[in-house]
Amino acid sequence: VQRGEHTVVVTPTASGKTLCYTLPVVAAAMRKQSKALYLFPTKALAQDQVAELLELNRAGNLGLRCHTFDGDTPGDARQAIRLHADLMVSNPDMLHQAILPHHTKWAQFFENLRYVVIDEVHTYRGVFGSHLANVLRRLQRVCAFYGAKPQFILCSATIGNPKAHAEALVEAPVTAITESGAPVGEKHLLLWNPPVVNPDLGLRASARSQSVRIARVAIKAALKTLVFCGSRTQVEVITKYLKEVFDRE
């Protein structure tokens, strides 16, 4: 990223992908009048990113202006965002319908646009992916009109062809980062065979009762615990059992 190359980062969850683009984007915005556009496929993800950026901004007293620009953005706030946002978080639909067609109003933003961050790129496949690729072509043409050539930083969950997928979206060579350098704690894999409760009939204890038993032991040992079930009903049943167990204790 620091070399100015288009980059796609494909590493596991909680491996620090967000920092891969947040640090260079924030550093560039602080050094000079540099803008960044973040694109997320859903409003929920966009709101989460804005919350993290605002927290970082407050903690470091950075003075950066970070805003969401989506369908819920009030009309009176849109002009201020166009003129003053350093980091703008949006989605492909808004870029297509509300930003690019009115690029003359966004001239100041596009002139200084240095980074375009696209998260969750594994979701952009099929027709949706084709639409995004065309929108990005339009974005690059508009940026070229204003004398800007933004660098693309893409992030994805694990996929088989990150480099080819990213290059198809941005139509340019992309460097793929596929190895995580994040520290990983020691792991133990245990396969649990429920005990036999009726030898004559060959019946074993239910998976539900054993899941509750194991989860109870783990929680009492202050271990972070996730229990995956095959259905929502099973999740609700196990949650109910665990609540009853701990309420009694």
Residue positions per predicted region:
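Conserved strand-helix element at the start of the C-terminal RecA-like helicase core
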Residues: K35-Q49, A215-V245
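Walker A/P-loop NTP-binding motif
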Residues: Q2-H6, T18-K32, R137-V142
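Conserved helicase motor
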Residues: C66-R78, P92-D93, S180-G181, G230-T233
